[in-house]
Swiss-Prot record:
Gene: APE2
Function according to Swiss-Prot or TrEMBL: Involved in the cellular supply of leucine from externally offered leucine-containing dipeptide substrates.
The protein's name: Aminopeptidase 2, mitochondrial
Enzyme category, top tier: hydrolase
Primary location: periplasm
Annotated transmembrane regions: none
Length: 952
C-alpha cells in the first residue's frame, strides 16, 4: 500500500462548513515556524503571516468533524512547542530519548475488534473497543497509531471525541475529549472507534492476496494479515508498539462460504442477516504485531500427534501438500516444550499458505502465515534445498512462539532476540530430527557466511541497532539480526556449554513470559545459569558494529602472535573505526586437541606452541571472526585437510576467499588451497568451494571472455573427476549426503560448461518437454533450466516460459521463473522484464527473475536500466516503507564491479528519496566498491596464475 505523504495542511470533513474553535495544540503546531516549510508552501509573493492565517482558517473545525494535519514533523517531540494545556502530553515523550513513541497517559489492556472485508470494494469495515488504563487523568487526549484509516467516530463511554487529529507522516491519530473526561472515570476507560480501512494489495496490514483457483481456474482473493513490524495500524487503530501488550478478542464477518481464522480458537459462530459471524476466544497478553486474522476459501490437513489441534490450511486443491509441515509442527512443538520446560499456551496451532506474501513466513501467535513455497511441499517434485528450507522455516516460526511471542523484545533494537533465537533454534531442532542433514556443518557455509558478508561492509550496523521510528524498522530485518544474532548464540552456547545455555534460556523465558525483555535480561539469565560474566563479554558483540580479522604471525620458533583489527571488505579501516577490542575465543586446534582457554581480549597476544607444525585458529568456526595466516601457513593447512573437521575445512575456504577479496592475502592463496581439495568428500565443503568460486566469478563478470573461460576451466579441472565419478543418476537408496553432493557437483559442472554434463542436462530437458515428466530428477530441475537458459534461444525460452505458466509444482514454477532471467538475448531480457509489471509475475516474486539476470553482464545492465526507467512504478507497487523495494534496489545495482557505476548509481538516486531503503543502497554501493577493488588489485596476478597453470 503506497504511503501517501501529505505536504499540505488539509481538512478532511464530513460536511460543508468549517467553523468553530480548534484544539489549541492544533494552532500552536501549525503556526510554529518549525513546521511551516513542511506543511504549506504558498504561491510566490504570499506573505508569511498570510500563510499562517490560511493554515489556521483551514484547520478550524466544529466537532465532531475531523481534521488531518499531515506533515513531516511529529505532533510532539522533545522540543515541541505544545500549548501549556497540553505540555504534559509533550513531556510524556521525553522519557525515551531517540524514539518516536506514543504518549503513555493511557495504555491498552484489551481490544475487542470486529472486521468485515468487502471483496468487491476492497475495503473493510471495522470497530474496535479498547480498554484503557488511565495513567494521567489530567490529560484528555488519546494518541494511537493509524495508517490509511478513515475514522468515522470515536468516543469514551458516552463522550464523543471533539476533534480527531491525524498526523500521516508520524502514523498517529489523536482523539481530543472535553476537559475533565478522563478524570471522570473511577476505573479504566473504554475507547470505541468505528472506521473503514483499505483491503490493500501491498502485502501489509489487512490485505488482499490474489490467486488462481486450482480447481476452477477463477481469479480469487483471500483477505489476510501481515502486521510485523508496524502494520497492525493499517488494520485497526491501535497502540502499535511491541511493549504495549494487551489481550485481543476478535470477531470476523463475511460471506458464509468463507473460512475464518484468527490467533485463537472459535468461541461462537452463527449466521446473521446472511453473514457468517465468528467470535474467537480471547488471546493471552501479546503485542499488536502478532495479531492475525484471515477470511478465505480454505481447506486443511492436520496432525493428531500433539495434544492440541495442529493444522495446515491452503486454498482448495493445495492442502494435500501440507502434511509434511503438519507432522513437523506437531513434533517440533513437543520438542520445544520439553527443551524449554514451558508448555505452548494456546489451544491450537494453525499454519496457513498465503499466495501473496512479502516475507518467507510470519510467526503470528497460533496462526502462522507462510509464502506458499515455504509451507507446502510436494516431496516428489522438490529439491533437497526446498525440503530443508520448508523444515527450517516451519521450525523457525514455531520457535518464535516462545522467542518473540511469549517473551517479546522491549523495543525494535532487540529484534535479534526474536530472530537470532528463532534461527538458532531452527538449526538446533533440525539437527535433532534430521542429523543426516548435518545442519551445524551447513551453518558455517550458510548462516555464518551471510552474517560476515553483510557485517564486513562499512554500512553494516550493530546487532542492537538504535531504531527511532517506524519507517526504519524494516531495514534491520537482515542478516545481522538473523544470521549474526544466531551466530552469536552459537558462540555463547559453545562457551557456556549447550546444556547450561539451554538452562539459562529456559530461566529467561520463565521470568519474562507474557512480558517484554531486553538483551541484558538474557545475559543475566545466562550468567545465573553458568556463573560467568556474560554481560560484559557479550555486550561488546551486540552493541558494536562489525567483527575482527585475527592476523597470525609466527617467529619460526614456536611463538605465535595474534592481533585483532576491525575487518572491512574494502580493507580501508580508519583509525576511528578500529577502536573496538572484541573478546575473541581463539579455540586453538593442534594435534593435541582444542585449547578453549585462550581468549584474545586485547589488541595482540603471543603464546608459545610446543609443536607448531599444525594449528588452526577458531576450531569448528564457532567464533564470529576470520583468520589471516601467513602464505606459508595457508599452504600447510591446504595439505593438512585430514586433520581438520568439516567445519574447519569450510572455514578455511571461506576465510581465504574473504581475505583474498579484501586484499589481506593474494587470490592465488585461495586458488592454490582449493585446487588441492579435488578429492573432498563432504558436500558442505564442496558447497563452500563452489560458492567461493562463484563469488570470484561474479567479481570478474565484466572481465574479457577469455578470462572468464579460464576461470571455468579452473573449475572444470577441480570438479570433473568427482562429478563424473558420482554421475547424475539419482537413486532413492542414496543417502541425503550423497544426493546433496551429486546435486552440488552436477550444478557446478553445468555452470563451468563441462561438455558431457551440459549435454546430459540438455537431453533431459528435451525429453521432459517431449512428455517424459520423469526425465529431469526433481533435485536438479533448477540446474537443468539454468543450463538451457545459458544456451539460450527463443525456442528454449518459450519452453521454459510454458513450464512457468503450467508447472507441476511450486518449486518448478519458481525454478522456471528464475531461469527466464538467465537468457541473455536482449529481446528475451526485455520480454522477461515486461512480465514483472503486466500481472504475469506476482509482486512478491518480481525479485526472482532478477536473481537470474545477475548471472551475466547483459542481465546486470538490462536490470539496472529497467530499474531507472520504471522507478516511479516500482515505488508505487513496492512502497519504501515496506521491505521489498530495498531488495529490488540491491538486486538492480550490486551486480556491477566498477567505480564508474557507483558514480552513475549515486547520480540517479541523488534526485530520489531513499527513505526506507537508504541502508540497502549504501550496502549495495559498498559491495560494488569491494568488488571493484578486488578485481583491480588482483586482475594481473589472477591472469598470471591462470596462464601459468594452463587454464587459458
Amino acid at each position: 500500500m503506497p504511503i501517501v505523504r501529505w505536504l499540505l495542511l488539509k481538512s478532511a470533513v464530513r460536511g460543508s462548513s468549517l467553523i468553530g474553535k480548534a484544539h489549541p495544540c492544533l494552532r500552536s503546531i501549525a503556526a510554529h515556524p518549525r513546521y511551516l516549510s513542511n506543511v504549506y508552501s504558498p504561491p510566490a509573493g504570499v506573505s508569511r503571516s498570510l500563510r499562517i492565517n490560511v493554515m489556521w482558517k483551514q484547520s478550524k473545525l466544529t466537532p465532531p468533524r475531523f481534521v488531518k494535519i499531515m506533515n513531516r514533523r511529529p505532533l510532539f517531540t522533545e522540543t515541541s512547542h505544545a500549548c501549556a494545556k497540553c505540555q504534559k502530553t509533550s513531556q510524556l515523550l521525553n522519557k525515551t530519548p531517540n524514539r518516536e513513541i506514543l504518549p503513555d497517559n493511557v495504555v491498552p489492556l484489551h481490544y475487542d475488534l470486529t472486521v468485515e472485508p468487502d471483496f468487491k470494494t476492497f475495503k473493510f469495515e471495522g470497530s474496535v473497543k479498547i480498554e484503557l488504563k488511565i495513567n494521567n487523568p489530567a490529560i484528555d487526549t488519546v494518541t494511537l497509531n493509524t495508517v490509511d484509516t478513515d475514522i468515522h467516530s470515536a468516543k469514551i463511554g458516552d463522550v464523543t471525541s471533539s476533534e480527531i487529529i491525524s498526523e500521516e507522516e508520524q502514523q498517529v491519530t489523536t482523539f481530543a475529549f472535553p476537559k475533565g473526561t478522563m478524570s471522570s472515570f473511577k476505573g479504566n476507560a473504554f475507547l470505541d472507534i468505528k472506521f473503514t480501512g483499505i483491503l490493500n494489495d501491498n502485502m501489509a496490514g489487512f490485505y488482499r492476496a490474489k490467486y488462481e483457483d486450482k480447481l476452477t481456474g477463477e481469479t480469487k482473493y483471500m483477505a489476510t494479515t501481515q502486521m510485523e513490524p508496524t502494520d497492525a495500524r493499517r488494520a485497526f487503530p491501535c497502540f502499535d508498539e511491541p511493549n504495549l501488550k494487551a489481550s485481543f478478542a476478535i470477531t470476523l464477518v463475511s460471506d458464509p462460504s468463507l473460512t475464518h481464522l484468527s490467533n485463537m480458537d472459535v468461541k461462537n459462530e452463527y449466521v446473521k442477516d446472511g453473514k457468517k459471524v465468528t467470535l474467537f476466544n480471547t488471546t493471552p497478553k501479546m503485542s499488536t504485531y502478532l495479531v492475525a486474522f484471515i477470511v478465505a476459501e480454505l481447506k486443511y490437513v492436520e496432525s493428531k500427534n500433539f495434544r492440541i489441534p495442529v493444522r495446515v490450511y491452503a486454498t482448495p486443491g493445495n492442502e494435500k501438500h501440507g502434511q509434511f509441515a503438519a507432522d513437523l509442527t506437531a513434533k517440533t512443538l513437543a520438542f520445544f516444550e520439553k527443551t524449554f520446560g514451558i508448555q505452548y499456551p494456546l489451544p491450537k496451532m494453525d499454519n496457513v499458505a498465503v499466495h501473496e506474501f512479502s516475507a518467507g513466513a510470519m510467526e503470528n501467535w497460533g496462526l502462522v502465515t507462510y509464502r506458499v513455497v515455504d509451507l507446502l511441499l510436494d516431496k516428489d517434485n522438490s529439491t533437497l534445498d526446498r525440503i530443508q528450507r520448508v523444515a527450517e522455516v516451519v521450525q523457525h516460526e514455531l520457535a518464535h512462539q516462545w522467542f518473540g511471542n511469549l517473551v517479546t523484545m522491549d523495543w525494535w533494537e532487540g529484534l535479534w532476540l526474536n530472530e537470532g533465537f528463532a534461527t538458532w533454534m531452527s538449526w538446533y531442532s533440525c539437527n535433532e530430527f534430521q542429523p543426516e542433514w548435518k545442519v551445524w556443518e551447513q551453518y558455517v557455509t550458510d548462516t555464518l557466511q551471510h552474517a560476515l558478508s553483510l557485517d564486513s561492509l562499512r554500512s553494516s550496523h550493530p546487532i542492537e541497532v538504535p531504531v527511532k521510528k517506524a519507517d526504519e524498522i524494516n531495514q534491520i530485518f537482515d542478516a545481522i539480526s538473523y544470521s549474526k544474532g544466531a551466530s552469536l548464540l552459537r558462540m555463547i552456547s559453545k562457551w557456556l556449554g549447550e546444556e547450561t545455555f539451554i538452562k539459562g534460556v529456559s530461566q529467561y523465558l520463565n521470568k519474562f513470559k507474557y512480558g517484554n525483555a531486553k538483551t541484558e535480561d538474557l545475559w543475566d539469565a545466562l550468567a545465573d545459569a553458568s556463573g560467568k560474566d556474560v554481560r560484559s563479554v557479550m555486550n561488546i558483540w551486540t552493541k558494536k558494529v562489525g567483527f575482527p580479522v585475527i592476523s597470525v604471525s609466527e617467529d619460526g620458533n614456536g611463538k605465535i602472535t595474534f592481533r585483532q583489527n576491525r575487518y572491512l571488505s574494502t580493507a580501508d579501516v580508519k583509525p576511528d573505526e578500529d577502536k573496538t577490542i572484541y573478546p575473541v575465543f581463539l579455540a586453538l586446534k593442534t594435534k593435541n586437541g582444542v585449547d578453549s582457554s585462550v581468549v584474545l581480549s586485547e589488541r595482540s597476544k603471543t603464546i608459545e606452541l610446543e609443536d607448531p607444525t599444525f594449528f588452526k585458529v577458531n576450531s569448528e568456526q564457532s567464533g564470529i571472526y576470520i583468520t589471516s595466516y601467513t602464505d606459508e601457513r595457508w599452504a600447510k593447512l591446504g595439505q593438512q585437510a585430514d586433520l581438520l573437521s568439516v567445519e574447519d575445512r569450510v572455514g578455511l575456504v571461506a576465510d581465504v576467499k574473504t581475505l583474498s577479496a579484501s586484499g589481506y592475502t593474494s587470490t592465488t592463496n585461495f586458488l592454490n588451497l582449493v585446487s588441492k581439495w579435488n578429492n573432498e568428500k563432504s558436500f558442505v565443503v564442496w558447497d563452500q568451494i563452489i560458492n567461493s568460486i562463484s563469488s570470484m566469478k561474479s567479481t570478474w563478470l565484466f572481465e574479457p571472455k577469455e578470462t572468464q573461460d579460464a576461470l571455468d576451466n579452473f573449475t572444470k579441472q577441480l570438479i570433473s573427476g568427482m562429478t563424473h565419478h558420482l554421475g547424475w543418476e539419482f537413486k532413492s537408496s542414496d543417502s541425503f549426503s550423497t544426493q546433496r553432493l551429486k546435486v552440488t557437483m552436477f550444478g557446478a559442472a553445468c555452470a563451468a560448461r563441462d561438455a558431457d554434463v551440459e549435454k546430459a542436462a540438455l537431453k533431459m530437458f528435451t525429453d521432459y518437454c517431449s512428455g517424459n515428466k520423469e526425465a529431469i530428477p526433481a533435485l536438479i530441475k533448477p540446474i537443468v533450466f539454468n543450463t538451457v537458459a545459458r544456451v539460450g534461444g527463443a525456442e528454449n525460452y518459450e519452453k521454459v516460459y510454458k513450464i512457468y505458466l503450467d508447472p507441476i509444482s511450486n518449486d518448478e514454477k519458481l525454478a522456471a521463473l528464475r531461469s527466464l532471467g538467465r537468457f541473455k538475448e536482449p529481446k528475451l531480457l526485455e520480454r522477461t522484464l515486461g512480465y514483472l509489471f503486466d500481472g504475469t509475475v506476482l509482486n512478491q516474486d518480481i525479485y526472482i527473475p532478477m536473481q537470474g539476470m545477475r548471472a551475466h553482464q547483459e542481465g546486470v545492465e538490462a536490470l539496472w536500466n529497467w530499474v531507472k526507467k520504471n522507478w516511479d512504478e516500482l515505488v508505487k507497487r513496492l512502497p519504501p516503507g515496506l521491505s521489498m523495494l530495498g531488495s529490488v534496489v540491491t538486486l538492480g545495482t550490486s551486480g556491477f564491479t566498477s567505480m564508474q557505476k557507483i558514480d552513475e548509481i549515486k547520480k540517479f538516486f541523488a534526485t530520489k528519496s531513499t527513505k526506507g531503503f537508504d541502508q540497502s543502497l549504501a550496502q549495495s554501493l559498498d559491495t560494488i566498491t569491494s568488488k571493484a577493488q578486488w578485481v583491480n588489485r588482483d586482475r594481473d596476478v589472477v591472469n598470471k596464475y591462470l596462464k601459468e597453470n594452463g587454464y587459458y
